[in-house]
């Protein structure tokens, strides 16, 4: 991808890592698109499937390295697609819980 060299080893290392990430992400995008997912949606589904304990939007954001606002929008879309459900705040519980649906489980794979 880059056809030039950096003088500093740190920049060369960064460039190689960045190229690797881009290649891996593109491959993931293509494969996940075949089942109607994006890498971001897949990461949320895997977090919902594999996390032990109560999973909140804030915890999902932390697990998938995204901002809370980004996750809120993503969860809205995923809930509309039937991939996750959000259980509203209940008395004595200060947060919304996110759960994977059977459809989400199927797409998340084994």
Kindly give the residue locations of the regions a language model identified.
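Terminal interaction helix/tail motif
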Residues: 109-110
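N-terminal helix-turn-helix DNA-binding core of bacterial DNA-binding proteins
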Residues: 22, 26-70, 91
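A structural signal for alpha-helical segments
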Residues: 4-8, 12, 95, 99, ...
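N-terminal positioning helix adjacent to the helix-turn-helix/winged-helix DNA-binding module
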Residues: 9, 13, 40-41, 56, ...
